[in-house]
Swiss-Prot record:
Signal peptide: none annotated. Keywords: Carbohydrate metabolism, Glycogen biosynthesis, Glycogen metabolism, Glycosyltransferase, Transferase. The active site is at residues 318, 371. Belongs to the glycosyl hydrolase 13 family. GlgB subfamily. It comes from the Bacteria. Its EC number is 2.4.1.18. It is an enzyme of class 2 (transferase). Monomer. GO terms for biological process: glycogen biosynthetic process. Catalyzes the formation of the alpha-1,6-glucosidic linkages in glycogen by scission of a 1,4-alpha-linked oligosaccharide from growing alpha-1,4-glucan chains and the subsequent attachment of the oligosaccharide to the alpha-1,6 position. This is 1,4-alpha-glucan branching enzyme GlgB.
């Protein structure tokens, strides 16, 4: 098995070692020989096609090179008893479209299939694979990759901008190409102060409305936006602007369209044999058989493909709960317990551990993030310590609790104060990312601004308050596109964001400015990210002031030289002469205030320093007396 950390060769032939590791489930570069590859055999240039179909009777390759006719010379030959098939076709070339005609050995029924390992595919509704051998690109991101390999993301800033390429911006109603995006996206993300962009799935999928989460071409770059070189150029440009690239990745299930992986050889192949495990009724997809060696190779090699070929810096693994639980989204009687009588998917657990183990060993500095909605333990604990091995986990509990809280009338918030404080009870159990993702602004859930309580002024103030509280809360950050300039309608994947409102309305322009300033503040203050997962980095001042719906806490840097005091007022009431305990004697200065006039607030700011007095309050020996603006987050800093 070739240990490969660079782009694929123009010529590569399958060897005995490749075959052995593939069937053992240990090949992590299967894309180097599976699929369609340029080859020279007996002095003749052509393409070698290889696929896996253990229950096939025959497989014929048809395409542009043979006028889509089934011909004897284009039938694959079995090269192992375990289902590997291969054929060399001399006149096939780069750019030719093709498919596999797969005949089942039991029924003699045949199906037309796209190549599971194809690097490029036709734009929907067409479904043919496309021979793609010209994928070489000269990268210019060496400095970024060197820095990435040395970075400890736990004690560095991470502020992620989640993005759906098809609807971020369009041009005359048409998708932007990767090259067109390269001209605007990196600059925008850099100017806004985000450290990473997270792309929703970029592999080929037939249905736009699936957002990429029901893929058919796991190795095929989304053809809506261009080709492989274009995507590489976009990633390169992002890296040269010091922006990391995270990719949403879907290893749990796949689309059931007939040209895809479903019943690839006429019988369960990539999916489980048992219908209770294979069929995902909730999403109308099929679940991967994660205990099958060749399927594990397909998926882990796919992760390696995106990381090696496109220099992806991290994978956000979608729907981890669906991988972990046999009874996920199933009623009693619709699932079969494991060998120990439990609901845990033992094969799924082993797969996730193996995936994370491989990436940790081979891809220095690449991170994995779990989207997991249950309380499964040790998701972000290293594999060698008994965990699943992810670097981070989305904090779905924090998201649900706080969005519920912020939608309440402030009159009633006092009765639900735990919703805004409970997250710190379990925060240190995982390496959490606080995420306000695409899932929260669709399907009737309302846009982020419309989740806020009150009239228009209070909605804007509530959004600024909430986002400032989020920046202060321990954990890395993620927000979905459009929220930064206050899109009022829910996200619609079929049209671009409503960018025009920034030019039309001052309130939208002010909020965009607020997000930029907030992101800059986060990036510049070590206390906000250096100790996200260390108890030293956070301390409550007062978590129990439910009557006034005020939170106050301290964020500290590792060396304790930086301390920030957050005061979050979740009511539309101004509090005068508010006594607050502080850890140190001295003078305190306001360093951020979400009520600032330049953000659209009421302008109740602290223009002068506040001096502490030696009076006990909130368990501290010193206290300050301040005015707290309505629906606002105030941040103070000890200056001397």
């Amino acid at each position: 098995m070739k240990n490969k950390n660079s782009e694929q060769n123009t010529h590569y032939t399958i060897g005995e070692q490749d075959i052995h590791y593939f069937h053992e489930g240990k090949h992590i570069y299967a894309y180097e020989f599976m699929g369609a590859h340029k080859a020279c055999e007996e002095g003749i240039e052509g393409i070698r096609f290889t696929t896996w179909a253990p229950n096939a009777k025959s497989i014929c390759v048809i395409g542009d090179f043979n006028y889509w006719q089934v011909e004897d010379k284009n039938y694959m030959e079995p090269i192992t008893d375990a289902g590997l098939w291969s054929v060399f076709i001399p006149n096939a070339k780069n750019g030719d479209k093709y498919k596999f005609v797969v005949t089942n050995k039991d029924t003699s029924h045949y199906v037309y299939k796209s190549d599971p390992y194809a690097f490029f595919s036709e734009l929907r509704p067409n479904t043919a694979s496309i021979i793609t051998t010209e994928t070489q690109y000269t990268w210019s991101d060496d400095k970024w990759l060197e820095k990435r390999a040395k970075t400890n993301y736990y004690d560095n800033p991470m502020n992620v901008y989640e993005l759906h390429l098809a609807s971020w911006k369009t041009k005359n109603g048409k998708f932007l190409t990767y090259d067109e995006l390269s001209e605007t996206l990196p600059q925008y993300i850099k100017e806004m102060g985000y450290t990473h962009v997270e792309f929703m799935p970029l592999h080929e999928h037939p249905l736009d409305a699936s957002w990429g989460y029901q893929p058919t071409g796991f190795y095929s770059v989304n053809s809506r936006h261009g080709d492989i070189i274009g995507l590489k150029r976009l990633v390169d440009k992002l890296h040269n602007n010091d922006i990391g690239v995270i990719l949403d990745w879907v290893p749990g299930h796949f689309c059931k369209d007939q040209h895809g992986l479903i019943y690839f050889d006429g019988s369960p192949c990539y999916e489980y044999q048992e219908p209770t495990k294979a069929i995902n009724k909730g999403w109308e997809t099929h679940n991967f058989d994660l205990g099958r060696n060749e399927v594990k190779c397909f998926l882990i090699s796919n992760a390696m493909y995106w990381i090696n070929e496109f220099h992806i810096d991290g994978l956000r693994v979608d729907a981890v709960s669906n991988i972990l639980y046999l009874n996920y989204d199933r009623e009693d009687g619709q699932w079969i317990p494991n060998i120990y009588g439990g609901h845990e998917n033992l094969e799924g657990i082993a797969f996730l551990k193996e995936l994370n183990g491989v990436l940790k060993h081979t891809c220095k500095g690449v991170i994995t993030i779990a989207e997991e909605s249950s309380s499964w333990p040790d998701i972000s604990t290293p594999v060698e310590k008994g965990g699943l091995g992810f670097d981070f986990k989305w904090n779905m509990g924090w998201m649900n609790d706080t969005l519920r809280y912020i939608s309440l009338d402030p009159v009633y918030r006092k009765y639900h104060h735990n919703l805004i404080t409970f997250s710190m009870v379990y925060h240190y159990s995982e390496k959490f990312i606080l995420s306000i993702s695409h899932d929260e602004v669709v399907h009737g859930k309302k846009s982020l601004i419309n989740k806020m309580w009150g009239d228009l002024w209070n909605k804007y103030a509530g959004l600024r308050l909430y986002m400032s509280y989020m920046i202060g809360h321990p954990g890395k950050k993620l927000i979905f596109m459009g929220s930064e300039f206050v899109q009022f309608v829910e996200w619609r994947e079929y049209e671009q964001l409503q960018w025009q409102v920034v030019d039309q309305y001052e309130s939208h322009k002010q909020t965009l400015h607020f997000f930029k300033k907030l992101n800059d503040f986060y990036h510049n203050e070590t206390a906000l990210w250096q100790c996200d997962y260390d108890h030293h980095g956070f301390r409550w001042i007062d978590a129990n002031n439910s009557q006034q719906s005020i939170l106050s806490f301290i964020r500290s840097s590792k060396d304790n030289k930086q301390k920030l005091i957050f005061i979050c007022n979740f009511t539309p009431v101004t509090y005068y002469d508010y006594h607050l305990g502080v850890p140190d004697a001295g003078s305190y200065k306001e360093v951020f205030n979400s009520d600032n006039l330049e953000f659209g607030g009421s302008g109740q700011v602290m223009a002068t320093e506040i001096f502490s007095s030696p009076q006990s309050s909130h368990g501290f020996e010193q206290r300050i007396t301040i005015k707290i603006p309505p629906m606002a987050t105030l941040v103070l800093k000890l200056i001397k």
